């Protein structure tokens, strides 16, 4: 069974890792007030990065709540996302959505992302940015 923790190795930590996902995403899943970008990472576990700016979500309380919900949802669904670097970009209005609706929305988005993954043969030529290079 895959552990459901959110340890340091499951986070995108450096600007270089974020840039790799932004520059060449292999998967894009637009959602209500957010965008999920994903890229193969060549590892056996997924990694998550969050982008929630003050322009999109004004109050720090709301930004922190969103980050907590996003991390928790990722943690519970990471078994279907193995081998991906994922960046979630928040957009205006995301802070006004209630927690149950957000949880439901993220469940659907993770399923869409898992379904939209390219086949392993298609990604054999693209090399991921792994955490040992940092």
Curated annotation (Swiss-Prot):
E.C. numbers: 3.1.26.5
Species: Pseudomonas putida (strain GB-1)
Gene Ontology MF terms in the entry: 3'-tRNA processing endoribonuclease activity; ribonuclease P activity; tRNA binding
Gene Ontology terms describing biological process: tRNA 5'-leader removal
Pfam families linked: Ribonuclease_P (PF00825)
UniProt-recorded name of the protein: Ribonuclease P protein component
The protein's assembly and partners: Consists of a catalytic RNA component (M1 or rnpB) and a protein subunit.
Keywords assigned by UniProt, alphabetized: Endonuclease, Hydrolase, Nuclease, RNA-binding, tRNA processing
Functional description taken from the UniProt entry: RNaseP catalyzes the removal of the 5'-leader sequence from pre-tRNA to produce the mature 5'-terminus. It can also cleave other RNA substrates such as 4.5S RNA. The protein component plays an auxiliary but essential role in vivo by binding to the 5'-leader sequence and broadening the substrate specificity of the ribozyme.
Matches recorded under PROSITE patterns: RIBONUCLEASE_P
Domain of life from the UniProt record: Bacteria
CC per GO annotation: ribonuclease P complex
């Amino acid at each position: 069974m895959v552990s459901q923790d959110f340890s340091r190795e499951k986070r995108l930590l450096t600007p270089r890792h974020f840039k790799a996902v932004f520059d060449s995403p292999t998967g894009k899943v637009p959602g209500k007030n957010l965008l999920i970008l994903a890229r193969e990472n060549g590892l056996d576990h997924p990694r998550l990065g969050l982008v929630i700016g003050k322009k999109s979500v004004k109050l720090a309380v709301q930004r922190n709540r969103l980050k907590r919900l996003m991390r928790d949802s990722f943690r519970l669904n990471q078994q279907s996302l193995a081998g991906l670097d994922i960046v979630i970009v928040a957009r205006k209005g995301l802070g006004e959505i209630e927690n149950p609706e957000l949880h439901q929305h993220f469940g659907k988005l993770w399923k869409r992302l898992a379904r939209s993954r390219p086949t392993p043969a298609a990604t054999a030529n693209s090399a991921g940015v792994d955490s040992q290079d940092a």
